[in-house]
Amino acid sequence: MRIYWTITGSVFKIGVLIVLLGAIQSCRSRKPQSENAVWGEIENKLGIRIQQRSDLQFYKEVVKWLGTPYKYGGNSSQGIDCSGFVMTIYEVVFGRKLPRQSAQQHKESRPVTAKKLAPGDLYFFDIQGKGVSHVGMHLTDDYFIHASTKKGVIVSSLKETYYSKSFVGFGAFRLGD
């Protein structure tokens, strides 16, 4: 009887050891996603090719908001407006508090040229002909992300007539500004 329990106990210990080794090996085989794969995923979601791959945290955050519905005065995933979107991204990604309204964001930003744009810099628009009333954030080339009144958070191009006609200028709120 004693031999039976010794053998049974040994088999049990070997079984536990095999299970533990398998678990350890599966943890080891899960490599973190490569940075190129992360960028590829972001580009697919945004529907654009990002030329200058910098500010990964910015891109990871804005992608989360794609498709969020528009809500005037909103600043949550349930609904957000253009200036609330900019304000939220700046606080989360850059740790910077911006004014709540697009006109005030324009007034307090530092003008920047197209050649000097960095991810997250702002695009300002006068949609209603009464001064700055819309804002978006630079992604790459002439692409920006913003909260559209009809489509929610989307990616658009400054080459689109609707935006090129109402474009006012670029602004920056970078560290040191």
Regions found by a protein language model. Name each.
Residues 2-14:
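Bacterial N-terminal signal peptides that target proteins for export
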Residues 22-26:
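C-terminal motif of bacterial Sec signal peptides marking the signal peptidase cleavage site
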Residues 28-40, 44-50, 96, 111-112, ...:
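Aromatic- and glycine-rich peptidoglycan recognition patches
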Residues 33-36, 40-78:
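Post-signal-peptide N-terminal segment of Sec-exported extracytoplasmic proteins
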Residues 45-46, 68-119:
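Catalytic cysteine-centered active-site loop
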Residues 120-122, 142:
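Structural motif
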